Design a protein with these regions (language model features):
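Exported/periplasmic ABC-transporter solute-binding proteins
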Residues: 2-226
Length: 226
């Protein structure tokens, strides 16, 4: 029994020694990895420019800030010019990254643009807060945006002209919205604005208006329809 106990202790000590050695190696490896990462951060320098979708502004700014925090010698500049403008800037070589809220067209891919999906966003249909209507069908939305329905009374609201607000041609949000409703190139807009924020501000201040915005930037200045 004594011998057995001694063997058990010896085995235990050996196991502990081996575990300690492995822990030391792991700690050393971790320290080396940390040092290597730190050196890489210090060595990386320069600037990155990106331009494009206004609906990606919050995401792009957050990514830029996080990247610059990790790599303090790198400057990331972001401009929000619209999806198509961002892709055009990428293809012309004036920016490093083009942010788009629409899929790349075949011609853009053929010219060298490579698509990387980084997030999925929704589109909210919004109206002026004083509008009594709470929901619309997809068919009703299509009829409003193509000019077939022009008065809120036709969709169970108070009688008032419907003011149709949207994004400018080339906007990724506009492209996605019109594609979902199958109304591409058929819409009649009272105002075509160059950013998601501008659409939301216009709808908030214009009685009887309707528009669409990125779900990511939706706030209580407008009413989202169900």
């Amino acid at each position: 029994q004594s011998g057995t106990t001694t063997e058990t202790k010896a085995d235990t000590n050996a196991a502990q020694t081996e575990a300690g050695s492995q822990a030391a190696e792991s700690t050393a490896d971790s320290a080396k990895d940390t040092q290597a990462a730190s050196e890489a951060s210090a060595d990386l320098s320069g600037s990155i420019t990106m331009a494009g979708s206004t609906s990606m502004e919050k995401l792009a700014n957050a990514v830029a800030e996080a990247f610059m925090e990790k790599y303090p010698n790198v400057t990331v500049n972001a401009e929000f010019t619209g999806s198509s403008a961002g892709i055009e800037s990428l293809l012309s070589g004036s920016v490093d990254i083009g942010n788009s809220s629409r899929a790349l067209e075949d011609s853009e891919k053929q010219n060298g643009a490579v698509e990387n999906i980084v997030a999925i966003d929704g589109i909210a249909v919004v109206v002026n807060p004083d509008t009594k209507v709470e929901n619309l069908t997809k068919e009703q939305l299509a009829q409003i945006y193509t000019g077939e329905i022009t008065d809120w009374a036709d969709v169970d609201g108070d009688s008032a002209p419907i003011v149709v607000i949207g994004r400018e041609a080339g906007s990724g949000t506009r492209g996605a919205f019109e594609e979902l409703l199958d109304v591409a190139d058929k819409c009649t807009y009272a105002s075509e604005l160059d950013s998601t924020g501008a659409v939301m501000a216009k709808v908030a201040s214009t009685p009887g208006s309707i528009g669409y915005v990125s779900l990511d930037v939706l706030d209580d200045t407008v009413k989202a329809l169900k």
